[in-house]
């Protein structure tokens, strides 16, 4: 993936996103991050066949978990929580780390368009030990899980069309408020969860303190905005710490936030594009 990935048209999303995160990086530094991100993605895809080894600490693989002592959901089994993460390292693994705290969780996943491949990945995910619910445009499945007292886990660093513009790396990104709204509705905790690739197939999952609104007297919409803004700040910290472990193959910011300098940098960064040629092609 580190060789072929940067040649794909999708890599221009990587370049634009990294140019926003690291505006002072030159073309070579940006391209190095693109390669690192593709390598991490390739490793994560290969690890589906070995999720059982990772989940159970076999053959040199495993998960080290660091847990905040402030999470009530872990000490009060009847209390659900909303766990949120980003497309970092192997983003399937936080669910297993939560299950290892003797806390059941339902992981929300995006089904693939290929039914056969989707079924294969679904079988591999069984090693995580959690319930699996396909993502939907409706929040009803999430409400059903929380109503039944089950925690949910969501990946929420994507740009969404129906979200709120909240800062991420100094620029507004359309951010979903759904996790915070659900936490407020069910009076449960909103908990950021980070995963890092430490070495090969060894990982560290950090379960942070629950996120609270800045103003407890604000209305619920404003509380949700404040909470998700804090989640975005967590994402900023994680991405700066391990940028090559961030999968950002989709647009994170609106096109209009890319100014002329960004576009100039991106064009210079892509060594697989030549004037007069046919643009990016897979090797």
Walk through the language-model features, giving the residues of each.
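Membrane-anchoring hydrophobic helices of lipid-metabolizing enzymes
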Residues: 1-85, 90, 120-121, 129, ...
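Residues that cap or flank secondary-structure elements
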Residues: 6, 62-63, 86, 112-113, ...
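Hydrophobic alpha-helical segments typical of transmembrane helices
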Residues: 14-17, 94, 116, 120-121, ...
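Non-catalytic C-terminal accessory region of glycerolipid acyltransferases
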Residues: 24, 32-35, 72-77, 100, ...
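Catalytic core of membrane glycerolipid acyltransferases/transacylases, capturing the structured
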Residues: 77-136, 161-166, 172, 197
């Amino acid at each position: 993936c580190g060789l072929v990935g940067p040649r794909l048209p999708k890599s221009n999303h990587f370049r634009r996103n990294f140019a926003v995160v690291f505006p002072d990086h030159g073309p070579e530094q940006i391209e190095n991050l693109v390669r690192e991100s593709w390598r991490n993605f390739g490793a994560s895809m290969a690890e589906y066949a070995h999720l059982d080894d990772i989940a159970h600490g076999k053959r040199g693989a495993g998960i080290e978990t660091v847990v905040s002592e402030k999470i009530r959901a872990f000490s009060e089994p009847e209390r659900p929580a909303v766990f949120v993460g980003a497309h970092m390292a192997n983003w399937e693994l936080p669910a297993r780390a939560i299950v290892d705290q003797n806390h059941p969780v339902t992981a929300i996943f995006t089904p693939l368009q290929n039914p056969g491949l989707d079924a294969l990945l679904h079988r591999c995910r069984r090693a995580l030990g959690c319930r699996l619910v396909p993502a939907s445009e409706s929040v009803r499945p999430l409400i059903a899980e929380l109503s039944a007292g089950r925690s949910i886990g969501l990946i929420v660093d994507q740009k969404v069309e129906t979200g709120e513009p909240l800062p991420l790396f100094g620029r507004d990104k359309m951010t979903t408020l759904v996790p915070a709204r659900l936490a407020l509705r069910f009076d449960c905790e909103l908990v950021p969860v980070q995963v890092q690739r430490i070495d090969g197939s060894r990982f560290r999952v950090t379960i942070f303190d629950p996120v609270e609104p800045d103003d407890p007297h604000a209305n619920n919409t404003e509380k949700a905005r404040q909470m998700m803004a804090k989640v975005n700040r967590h994402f900023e910290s994680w991405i700066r710490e391990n940028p090559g472990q961030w999968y950002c193959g989709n647009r994170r910011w609106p096109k209009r936030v890319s100014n002329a300098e960004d576009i100039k940098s991106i064009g210079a960064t892509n060594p697989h594009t030549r004037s007069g040629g046919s643009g990016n092609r897979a090797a």
